[in-house]
Amino acid sequence: LSYDGNSGRADATGNVVITQADKTMTGAKGWYNTKTQEANLDGGVSMIGSDMAMSAQTVHSYNNNKFTANGSVHLQRADRQIFGDSVEYSTDSEYGLVTGNARLIAEGTTLTGDKVEGWMKEVRAVAQGNVTFSNPERNVSGSADRASYTRTPN
């Protein structure tokens, strides 16, 4: 572990644990900047928060409310899940952009594509490229180049 008081950056290797607000991130190596509230972890990263969980190969976190994750990313929040090669996500807006093997699961519907944008607060998503969708409970499935999914009002 090393710390530079001028820059506010701490670097660590071996079972690194970083706690930011309600989130705890673990990984093989990483750094955290106390001045910018920016963190980076690499090597089997997991992040657990009060209402979410995520795993990835690498995670870069900004200001306690936004992150980018790469490498077999899996994010779960309530009954909604996101999978992909790369994920950018804002916990404030609950907006996510998933690229590469993108998959979104929400309310019994699975939506896949090369790229999926999701607005989790709204239960709304747009998928592009090699899109598939299915909801076995409603006996519906399909495929397209582009698809939009929104929750039906009650």
Which role fits each region the language model picked out?
Residues L1-N154:
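Structural signature for solvent-exposed beta-strand/loop edge elements and short helix-capping sites
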